[in-house]
């Protein structure tokens, strides 16, 4: 069992938890993920490592409350324990030797982008960060990004905070201002990453994307997280989650991402009923 030592609501639908997991904290690197199961009879879900403290032996996870399992996870309180917490899994993001990078995060994807931006900053890399949200009330981790970014652009769809617009507009502006990046790292909704990659292609920039499809075992056995990358089948859990943005078949990934929505909706309703929570 893995004890919850801290729990914070970052916005109405996103929660941060700090979990006691010394062996994972000792080995975790930015870009890797954990397979989490809140209760013995819960489904397994992948959550990317959002931070770690090797001395304290803790690992941070940040998740959006969208389905049955995340509702169950969010029902746990400080002092209680998560049933399964397996990792670190996947390949760490390669950050060595980079001198100037733009990190682009969207929504809860910013939780994945943050430890990568931190690692780059600690290595002396110039980091420009662009984060996007639908509105001000969904904003997360602004101060944390400020602390590890040489420049930070905050975008909101409705203009309620930062600059009104999408993250690709900010990337266009940064390049127009004379910035040339060794790499653009983008993490967020599939449609956002698809258009960030297109923007990078327009400017001749290399990009990598973090793919977080449906995942069950996290070791490549089930095939649930398969993707087409460069015309070949890859598995996000063992070959990724980072891939060359130019090679990912985003349309296929988006189509696969909608396959289980009816089941997810039923699981969400069942979890809400079980925990006496209102379905929103």
Residue ranges of model-derived segments:
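Structural signal for conserved beta-strand scaffold positions within catalytic alpha/beta enzyme cores
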Residues: 6, 51, 154-156, 209, ...
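A generic structural signal for residues embedded in beta-strands
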Residues: 36, 84-85, 227
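Short, Lys/Arg- and Gly-enriched loop/turn segments at beta-strand edges
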Residues: 42-50, 89-99, 237
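Local cysteine-cluster metal-coordination motifs and their immediate loop/turn environment
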Residues: 112, 190-191, 212-242, 270-275
């Amino acid at each position: 069992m893995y004890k919850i030592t801290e729990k914070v609501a970052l916005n109405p639908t996103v929660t941060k938890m700090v979990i006691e997991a010394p062996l994972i904290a000792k080995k975790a690197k930015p870009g890797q993920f954990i397979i989490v199961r809140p209760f013995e009879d819960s489904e397994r879900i992948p959550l990317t490592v959002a931070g770690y403290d090797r001395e304290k032996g803790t690992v941070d996870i940040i998740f959006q409350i969208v389905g049955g399992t995340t509702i169950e996870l969010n029902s746990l309180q400080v002092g209680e324990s998560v049933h399964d917490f397996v990792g670190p899994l996947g390949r760490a993001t390669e950050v060595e030797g980079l001198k100037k990078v733009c990190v682009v995060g969207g929504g809860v994807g910013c939780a994945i982008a943050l430890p990568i931006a931190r690692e780059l900053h600690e290595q002396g890399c110039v980091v420009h960060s662009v984060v996007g949200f639908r509105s001000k009330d969904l904003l997360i981790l602004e101060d944390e990004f400020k602390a590890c970014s040489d420049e930070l652009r905050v975008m909101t769809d409705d203009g309620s905070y930062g600059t009104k617009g999408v993250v690709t507009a900010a990337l266009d502006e940064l390049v127009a201002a004379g910035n040339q990046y060794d790499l653009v790292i983008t993490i967020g909704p599939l449609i956002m990453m698809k258009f960030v990659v297109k923007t990078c292609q327009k400017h001749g920039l290399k990009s990598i994307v973090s793919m977080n499809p449906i995942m069950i075992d996290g070791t490549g056995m089930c095939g649930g997280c398969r993707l087409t990358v460069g015309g070949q089948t890859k598995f996000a859990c063992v070959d990724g989650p980072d891939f060359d943005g130019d090679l990912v078949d985003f349309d296929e990934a988006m189509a696969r991402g909608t396959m289980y929505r009816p089941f997810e909706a039923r699981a969400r309703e069942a979890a809400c009923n079980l925990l006496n929570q209102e379905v929103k």
